[in-house]
Curated annotation (Swiss-Prot):
Belongs to the arginase family. Catalyzes the conversion of N-formimidoyl-L-glutamate to L-glutamate and formamide. Mn(2+) 2 binds at residues 166, 168, 259, 261. It catalyses: N-formimidoyl-L-glutamate + H2O = formamide + L-glutamate. The lineage of its organism: Bacteria, Bacillati, Bacillota, Clostridia, Eubacteriales. It comes from the Bacteria. One of its GO terms (molecular function) is agmatinase activity. This is Formimidoylglutamase. Mn(2+) 1 binds at residues 137, 166, 170, 259.
């Protein structure tokens, strides 16, 4: 049981246009989404060809601890609203489920991340692909822990690679038990060291002006890999693709996480730390699709959508389109795309 801080799907968020109530080719996501309550003990594993489960992480405590601009706790609501009208560009054998939200209210960040970990573990055990809606980027720690917990039932030492699209390395120092939205990948490194696990971390879109020299030194010490945003924007992308290939070949599983501040503020103004020289979303989506085609990706999240700063829901809409691209790409991999 996930307790009172888990709230099952609120179907009110799934409202939109209806062109037909019978012709699936005219369906939008709000017509195809099904609620799933992770608190139920009698849930049976999904036996269809391909299923996705959305779960929101309504939290910005990590952002507050990181002295950023709070507001991302409301992100999952607005992302759902933007996803509602997306078209079903897949066959009816692809199923979409909404697993509700983890609410980090009147509990600690660490308790919230533990709840998310349990939820991710359960979603994976149901044979569904988790897509987490943030929430601050502290969502990454809970998502990773859930993936790790699930994979340990298969292999005591799973080989998991992390690909993070982010302007920040997020490997800041932290006090034990008090992480933030800027510490997750250092916390994961510490867990890997403690449990003798492989630590494989690649950060795409790093901004030199957003990280201290000590953080780059720490990244090198930890064996983390990173690609600067300027090298993606102005460099030879084939070199970046080769770097991705080298990284992905060494992994058995890949967890992909996107911090919305990786994007230029022209496309993503509603974030905690906006980036005037961030990446063009088209470039990021191209890399995400390439990573997905490795067929190793086990979980995905997009974080730091903050409605408080998001005039016209521009950033939430971008997050929805990124998620659309994820589902569209995986559906095509399974031969279920249209």
């Amino acid at each position: 049981m996930l307790g009172i801080n888990y709230k099952p799907c609120n179907e009110d968020f799934w409202q939109g246009r209806t062109d037909s109530e019978e012709n699936f080719l005219a369906f939008r996501w709000h017509q195809w989404i099904k609620p799933i309550n992770l608190n139920k003990d009698d849930l049976s594993p999904f036996t269809g060809k391909l299923g996705f489960a959305f779960i929101g992480f309504c939290c910005d405590e990590g952002i507050r601890r990181n002295k950023g601009r709070t507001g991302a706790a409301k992100g999952p609501e607005t992302i759902r609203e933007e996803m509602a009208n997306l078209p079903c560009c897949f066959t009816d054998e692809v199923k979409l489920f909404d697993a509700g939200n983890i609410l980090v209210e009147n509990i600690s960040l660490e308790e919230g991340q533990d709840l998310l970990s349990k939820a991710i573990n359960k979603i994976l055990s149901l044979n569904l692909f988790p897509i987490v809606l943030g929430g601050g980027h502290e969502v990454a720690f809970g998502n990773y822990l859930g993936v790790l917990s699930h994979l340990k039932t298969i292999n005591s030492k799973p080989n998991i690679g992390i690909i993070n699209f982010d302007a920040h390395l997020d490997i800041r120092p932290y006090t034990e038990g008090m992480g933030s939205s800027g510490t997750m990948f250092r916390q994961i490194s510490d867990i890997c060291k403690k449990e003798d696990l492989n630590y494989s971390y690649l950060c795409m879109g790093v901004q030199k002006h957003s990280n201290t020299l000590e953080l780059f030194k720490t990244a090198d010490k930890l064996g983390a890999n990173y690609v600067f945003a300027k090298n993606i924007t102005y460099g030879d992308n084939w070199i970046v693709f080769e770097s991705l290939d080298d990284f992905m070949k060494a992994q058995d599983y890949i967890y992909v996480t996107v911090c919305s501040d990786v994007f230029s503020s022209a496309f993503a103004p509603g974030v905690s730390a906006s980036q005037s020289l961030g990446l063009d979303p088209e470039i990021v989506v191209r890399f995400i699709k390439y990573i997905l085609r490795s067929n190793k990706v086990i979980s995905f999240d997009i974080a730091e959508v903050s409605p408080r700063f998001d005039q016209g829901h521009v950033t939430a809409n971008l997050a929805a389109v990124v998620i659309f691209s994820v589902i569209d790409t995986i559906a095509k991999i399974y031969g279920l795309g249209l």
